[in-house]
Amino acid sequence: MPATDRKIRYPYAGSKSHHVTLGVFDTQSGKTIYLNTGEPAEQYLTNVSWTPDDKYVLVAVVNREQNQMWFKQFDAATGAFVKTLFEEISDKWVEPQHPAVFVPGSNNRFVWQSDRDGFNHLYLYETDGKVIRQISKGKFPVTSMYGFSTDGSHCFFQTADETGLNRYVWTANLKDGSSRRLNEEEGVHNGIISQNGDWAVDIFSNLATPRFIYTQKTTPGAVRNLAFGAKNPLEEYQVGITKFTSLPSPGGVRLNARLILPANYDAGKKYPAIIYVYNGSHVQMVTNSWMGGGEMWMQRMANEGYVVMSIDGRGSANRGCEFEQSTFRHLGDFEMEDQLTGVQYLQAQSYIDPARIGVFGWSFGGFMTTSLMTRPEAKGVFKCGIAGGPVLDWRMYEIMYTERYMDTPQENPEGYTQNSLYQYIGNLDGRLLMIHGTSDPVVLWQHSLKYVQECVKKGKQIDYFVYPEHEHNVIGPDRAHLYEMVERYFKDHL
């Protein structure tokens, strides 16, 4: 197969980082003015925005350690640093993900998102750095900022609830700080707000509802009108029984889990089970939406006689900082505890065959799958596993992601060593299939190639498959091939 060499910038955790500059290109003169972002050169320039008058550029500057952020203002015409509006500091990490959004009609008031109180919320600021008020409040995060009314008096946003399962649309009065939820029914509400802020479109689903679309005024007491009600697109098909459960975590919090049982479920039978795992940052797999956030291949496996389970353990998204940051410096440890809590739940069910439990995951989920198949804490639990695009040693993963959650290998050698999975190969008892795209720029092919090499050295047999020219995810028509292989592997070995 012909190949071409494609170079990418990929500094490993603990290595020298690339240096980034930020420039303003003048389309009239053809000149570029670079912002004087200063030293140290190893810093992250994130969430760039403009003031409405186009005179200034605002940048969230994050240090290499990612535990401090400075929100800085620069002169767009000269590149000169003007001032720091405010700072944010954490004993774990700061991770600004949204640029400043200016209030319509104002050149000096903007909304900033921050998790400084433990949950991601909205704050109204002035460009002198003064915070006017916190707009959203509660033990749940803002999950989306929709925008403003034309006159700038109100803003609109979406939040999760305290369970993390549901989503609601809110409006807030920027003048007096009052806020109000626009919908009550449990489920996932996604909003579209009219330009003047008078009307909202509510796109709603929950476990029992494929999709309803409502329109309503945003004023208090407004009645919503059903504009569209989708029929069940799967009503002619046999689908599994999807349900939620809440599990006690060893960390003292409740974990959301989703179970899909065969459509012809018989309580007197013993079923094999598959845990589909991710459990990494920024991902939530279990939501009170149509099919519970599950995917169609899970329904397929349920139809083939498997129980499919997913657990959002500590470290996953939309449960607040304490939940999400509990894994700091030890990626993989608490996540394993929580996934094994799910296994214990399965083993306690009379309809599960405890000797036939498998696990499947991709990317961070591939890391978790390999951990669960080989680390001593899970010895003998899983009969087989499938690890796709797996991180196998965090010292070989990219700098920004890894150092945010683990610090550097020099600062945290114990954490990196504990979660390097090559050392656990000797513990492998069940069947393990490892899959990788040969052009993966996210988790380099080196991870799994080295794993195979170490298996050879230690006399351990694994199954290995590559997708030529695919990157981190197998996409296009080849994805059908992937899931056929997954199904066959579980049928053959579980």
Question: Predicted segments — roles?
Answer:
Residues 1-34, 219-232, 285-295:
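Predominantly five- to eight-bladed beta-propeller fold
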Residues 7-21, 36-62, 68-76, 81-113, ...:
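Conserved beta-propeller blade repeats
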Residues 16, 65, 116, 163-164, ...:
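Short flexible coil/turn linkers enriched for glycine and charged/polar residues
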Residues 19-21, 66-73, 118-123, 164-170, ...:
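Structural motif
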Residues 26-30, 76-79, 126-130, 173-177, ...:
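Short loop/turn segments that connect beta-strands within beta-propeller blades
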Residues 33, 82-83, 132-133, 180, ...:
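A structural motif specific to WD40 beta-propellers
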Residues 36, 85-86, 136, 312, ...:
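Residue-level recognition of beta-strand->loop/alpha-helix junctions
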Residues 54, 60, 188-494:
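Serine-hydrolase catalytic core recognition
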